[in-house]
Amino acid sequence: HSEADTIDKIDKDLFAKHLKFYAILLFRLCNSLIVPYDLVAVADELINHLNELKRLAENLPVNLEQLIEEAKSFKEVAIKLNACKMRVEEAYVKASDKSIVGEAARMINKALIRIVHELSHIMRTEAGRYGYDPYGYYLTGKPIPRVYIPIIKMNELDPNSTEYRLWETKLRRELNRVLDAIENSIDYGTMTLQIVGKCLV
């Protein structure tokens, strides 16, 4: 946005449509027992991004197989979390004492939000968790921007150059960040499933 983006530039009909959309979204979020996140869709997107990066890096000395396998493991946890979420929502409706089931729902909410925060900064930004990508930044539409950039740069450079080795180091660091985020997400999900499973017995 710029200083020229003043109120007179707004398409009032489109603005009203957006406001209605956001109002419905907020209403549903505020009235849901558990946040309506679909981690399976996130896992599928992550796997697709990693496969695309693997294709782009096929001539580079880097192996993305471990990341792809971890992303598939995360998808398995996400499927279990989705099933657990549905069980908790059903149990909450039927429960006469909603405190225990409500606590299980709170734990699932916390895990879902934590996992989404963990994965969002690696999947959607170049700047990372605490940085800021400018509005409309073209790289945010690329698969895992912080990994995409070093791969593209390395493909353009002479493998014997110093700059190539610097980008290779950057790539390995970014791949480690992605791996950490996926492993942390698996851990959050697995621990939550274990704890919630005990609550529902």
Each model region followed by its residue ranges:
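Secretory-pathway/membrane protein signature
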Residues: 1-201
